[in-house]
Amino acid sequence: MSSFRSIRSAIALLLVGLLCEITLGEVPILAIDAVYPPVLSTAHPNPLKISAGRFTQDIDALVFSDPRISAVLEPAPNLALDDVPQKNFGSFTVTVDPATPPGFYEVWASGRYGISNPRTIAVVPTPVEQLPGNIDPKNPIEVKPAICYVGTTKRSDTVIVKTKKTDHWPKCLIAAQVLDAATLPTLTVTDGKQTVLSQLRAQGKRPILFETPTVLPRQPVDEIYLKIYDFLYRGAETASFALVIDPPENHPLLTTAAWKPPFSVFEESLASWPTVDPGTIPANGLFPAPAWQTTIELTSQNPKAQIEFPVAEGQAYECEVFSASQGQLSDIRIVADRIAPAPTPEQLIEIQAAMDAPSGTALDPALEQRVKDYRPRIQTAGREVIAIAEDGPGAGTRAVRLSSADPIATIPAGPVTKNVRLSITDLQMTPSGKWPTRLTLRVGPAIPRFHAVGHWVPDTNNAVQAKTTGVSLSKGGQCAMQVSVRRAGGFAGPIRVTCENLPPGVSVVPAIIAPGQTETQLIFYAEENATSWVGTIQPVAKGTSTDPNNAMQELAVPIRAGTIALSASGDRGLPQSRLSSQWQLKVIEQEVAPIQIRAGDGPDWVLEIPLGGSGKLPIKAVRRAGGDQKGVMRPQNLPAKVAFGEFELPPNAAEATPEIKVAADAAPGEYTVWFQTEIILKQSLHPESHARLVAYRDRIQAKLADPNWAGDRPMAEKIIAETNPKIDALAKEIAPRDFPTFLSCAPFKLRIVPAPEAPK
């Protein structure tokens, strides 16, 4: 009987990975929502498993952001009566070189349906132990220092562990969201009599850190109990956490610096200016004339900072704050006003006397002016406000937002007889706030610049539905990268976007982000003869500006990779996105894409239309099996005053020539337009599972057909009897099915030129 159970287990092993996801309606692209454990040790080999995701079939390799971390796919037990080696797809043994610095890294999974989105992992020098999922609350596990424990929260269950109290209260660290986990951990600390000593909840990406009780126990305590659960009660494989007792001050899980929101790119590539230490500025003293940068800390006791500095004749300045971009839960406001220099001590005595004088007292005109100049220092009425800034300008998509709560403002040129005063507050700060707000302030001449962030286009641009996504570029197919930019420092020109380091057989159509636009898409195409490839690529954005001597200079910045770290959901709200360290691309060679749609005649082709004119756009489609349905093509990123509505690419049609009309008052320039094509594609999902089961059945049949085979013939006959119905059922499951999709495709350059002059 046990041998027959092993037969069923063997067949189930071949089927796993297909049937669990067979009902999904989206085009197959690998995405992972969790790896477990999310912490790796340099002290020993680490088991690591892809614990949650979509289209995770045949994950056979991991890519790490550091080459000193490597993974080997674990083998699976051989199938019954079979000697062909099997693979335990999605399960690995990971080795971390002891020379790898403790910190945060990224991992990508490579499988049948592309390469996944990155997931954050931490590397620690101590052993890592996994907490069991069924801890008896009456007999909790004891956790000790010098070990990193990892666990998951399951629905409303509470993970209970205990630790010793020695001559000091043990410091207890719990990290979760900095590891891309969906957990919002909550910690309740009790003594042995279940008296609550502290209750703590994570704030954003910050870890929980218990150091001393909020309520001191009445009796001596030898050990404390830690009750850990997910505040939102939605625990699952994606809701993991890490626990460390008495971590050293440099423990990587104590910091959130590695988890960078997309808008943190605004702080990158900026020239370093002289740093001013606020502690060296005397009370009511002046900062030097810009350019400079400084670091300020706001607290509930000191929630407002004021900085005053002189200005240069005719010089405008740019003032920018970086706080939320550094992981702070802040919302900074800056108010800039012009103010007369502070009076001397002798003048201040005269001013105070004049202000205390009875109403109607005649004053010397010079003294009256000094009183007038002094009042804005002690009251808000009458201030010469020149700038107010809160949130930065918005950009990005609803999936990966490039909008920052950090303000940026322009201080216009003004008279040197007055200083500029900056009043800085955090609108999120409360009188009982526990956490200080740290910020970097830069003030200096405007530097023309732009920053760019991209992300692989998810299957939806609806923020309520956006979820993690990887990338899969099939032979003869296409995939898309959304690119968002923010201009600053007076730069307002066009930005050219392209990609470098592409493999043979893969090309990209360069794009233009015109003045006034902030978005475009890069469309990647693979030829039919492209070969399998996995590697890093480098998208870049370029523009031109003038230097201080009015000479033309090229600006070039890498397009930073953005990724959805947490999918949108009803209980956790909009998707959460962060920056990634690199771009990974995978070319799939197992199949050819059902359709490829292009516009024009090559990547450098331009459709030129004069103002008030029209033109025909040649659309060409290469259709293959599964790509014969009609497509509704909707143009994206159209400039104003250009008429170009959606149109149909009829079933099986290989060409279309829609008309574009340009109004006489449109803005001349060069633009990139692409299409979002709504189409139903037919594909077989993971046909390899069927082929493997057939091959296994055939190997067993071959053994039975061999008269010299001395194996267990009754078991072999049983295997065949149980396998044949599975093969028939699986043949139906892998039959091509409909995948409704929105395909980004057919980019082209539209050049709008002035109308030709009428003949005289």
Where are these regions (language model features)?
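Proline-anchored loop/turn motifs at beta-strand termini and strand-loop-strand connectors
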Residues: 37, 65-70, 97-99, 164, ...
